Amino acid sequence: MPQNRSMESQAYSLPLILPDLRREEAIHQITDTLQHLQTVSNDIFSRILQRVETNRGQLQRINGRLSLAQAKIERLKGIKKAIKVFSSAKYPAPEHLQEYSSVFAGAEDGWLAKKLRHKIQSKHRPLDEQAVQEKLKYFPVCVNTRGQDEESAEEGLGSLPRNISSVSSLLLFNTTENLYKKYVFLDPLAGVVTRTNPALEGEDEEKLFDAPLSITKREQLERQTAENYFYVPDLGQVPEIDVPYSLPDLPGVADDLMYSADLGPGIAPSAPGVPIPELPTFITEDITENSRTDSQDGRLLPPPPPPPPPPPPPPPPEPSVLSPPTSLAPPLPIPAPARVGSSDVGDPGSLQGAPKEVVNPSDGRASLLESIRQAGGIGKAKLRNVKEKKLEKKKMKEQEQVRATGGGGDLMSDLFNKLAMRRKGISGKGPAAGEASGDGPTGAFARISDTIPPLPPPDQASGDGDEEDWES
């Protein structure tokens, strides 16, 4: 009988012709095997041809798409118009891919379905033991060793079962005996031995390994610097290309390119992704006009206080009580528009450091600006601090008191003190010689006049003449 040894991965199987058959029986098996071989070979080649035809059809469809795309490209080569090509973000493939199927998928072995029966007329030959023994020298023989395995299994429980999942299921409880290999009668709880501490029994302890050199020799390992693997893109140097704006009549170049779409931010982080926002524009015309009207109306700055009435020109003091010379009086810190508005109201005597021809202005703003230019402006004016003036007055009063007390018996000193007090009374700086108390209106006027800076002498020549008049 033929042996059908087919595997699961094989789609076809062929029977083998056994030796030592009768002639008629051998002929029948040979014919049946050859017929089955022809059937299998025909099926194999038909399946291969079918797969080749399928692949050929797919290749023809791909070639058709390629030829169509090539024809479109050839047509677009001569056009001088700009063409936008929209590419899909997804790969042009079906959602569900077709799984690969084997060429021999679904093949059936017809030999297993066939059950051919032939009636043999010839009889079996008698068995020849000597011929069988001679054939054992040339043919492999399967020896049955099952009996020996059964005899060796009598010592234990036998082969290991398939449902063992752990070592504890293999060994005897609380022991190291494998009962499947050697079966022994042993009480697992009787032979329990407690192990004592090996240090108490004098056993040698296992020594630890030596410490590393970094601990024994106090050496410090050098810290290795970690390498930086971060991706830092660099734009590099972009070459400057000087080309004309338009190149007409070039083959393969469109002449109606219009780049009006926003390209979006760049991919390089070093390049500025977003343009710098522009600041909002402020309307300054209304603000300037309002400020001008306020300055003209006198609402931008408080109006300056009215100047006091001009006192009579004081005589030049003696060298002993002479105050520090001041070339120019400090002008009032008022902007030009405000001063123009208040020039009509103020007194001409308020311009102390200006020349004489500017005191009586003829035409408003022009004469005022001219007087400021002639006086040298604010930068050339020698301004003095109010605190320094007060300290100087205080020192002068102390010196006068010391001189008055120290030279009381001298006739010339008494005359000098009286003359100085008289001059102060005339100039408004202090009480006159005939006034005994300062509680009257003259004392209040003197205190007010002390807060006002003194007027400088208008001219050196006039000062000399006044001094001569006083001495005479």
Swiss-Prot record:
Compositional bias, Pro residues, is annotated for 301-319, 327-336
Compartments in which it is found = Early endosome membrane; Recycling endosome membrane
Annotated region Disordered: where?
Answer: 289-365, 377-412, 426-472
Q: Name one GO molecular function term.
A: alpha-tubulin binding
Entry keyword annotation includes Protein transport:
yes
List the GO cellular component terms: cytosol; early endosome; early endosome membrane; recycling endosome; recycling endosome membrane; WASH complex
Question: Could you mention a single GO BP entry for this protein?
Answer: Arp2/3 complex-mediated actin nucleation
Give the residue ranges for region: Required for WASH complex assembly: 1-51
The entry's keywords: Actin-binding, Endosome, Membrane, Protein transport, Transport
| Region spans: VCA | 352-472
Instruction: Cite the record's note on assembly.
Output: Component of the WASH complex.
Q: What does the UniProt function comment say about this protein?
A: Acts as a nucleation-promoting factor at the surface of endosomes, where it recruits and activates the Arp2/3 complex to induce actin polymerization, playing a key role in the fission of tubules that serve as transport intermediates during endosome sorting.
Q: Domain description from the entry?
A: The VCA (verprolin, cofilin, acidic) domain promotes actin polymerization by the Arp2/3 complex in vitro.
Entry-linked PANTHER family: CXYORF1, WAS PROTEIN FAMILY HOMOLOG 2-RELATED
Stated name of the protein: WASH complex subunit 1
What is the originating organism of this protein?
Answer: Xenopus tropicalis
